[in-house]
Amino acid sequence: GLVGSEMCIRDRIDAINAQARKAFPDLEFREAYTSRIIIRRLKTRGVVKNTPLDALLQLRGEGYTHIIVQSTNIIDGVEMESLRRDVESVLPFFKEIRVGTPLLYSVEDAEKVTDILGQRLNASVQQSAKKKGKEHFVLVGHGTYTPGTATYSQMDYMLKVAGFGNFHVGTIEGYPTFETMLAQLKAAKAKSVTLVPFMFVAGDHAKNDIAGEWREMLEKEGYTVHVRMEGLGQIPEIQKIFVDHIRFGLKHRT
């Protein structure tokens, strides 16, 4: 099953589902959402979505014995912990349940994402009108209060090591903070900044916090600010990493 947590922009979720179905034509797929707020919102529009627990119990009722649960989370944070708890609660009902890893789990995952985003975003500037000075990109993640927040700092570090010195990572609710990221922009003498959601879907969170608050705060500091409303789930190479995690989960016990 594929698990989504942000306000669903349907085609983003559908795109990764399509990639997964194509890669594993013999598997039965179910979709679930970890956010009860999103589930409630969708219900008011007549769209019914299960929580992971509901989806698992439904599969049990249909007689399935071997399950792999793949999340679309970016880091191994609170939502992954909650998902694993749900899985543990129904373990006795199945012969086996495996849980696939989030996007950024291994060093190799982070290196791949660094390369994908670095190349893609730098290329997006080269295609547009040639600007004076270098465009700086700020990847904005949700953030978390668990040790998983270190993943964001790792991404910031890896981007710079890979030669993408014009990339900086910040989080809305964790570390690196807005202030930490701002200090980096100042040190780099940046003038023009593009904000990019470091989230699977660029939903309400991204619109309010990134296109709203962060943009305003940076403009107050004197920066020219652009916003690129593209969630990670839109990028085919990122979708492929999630599909690879399913493949790994099918081959190895996790």
Predicted regions and their residues:
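Phosphate-coordination/substrate-recognition cap region in phosphate-metabolizing enzymes
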Residues: 73
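Non-catalytic structural scaffold of enzyme domains
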Residues: 10-68, 76-194, 199-204, 212-254
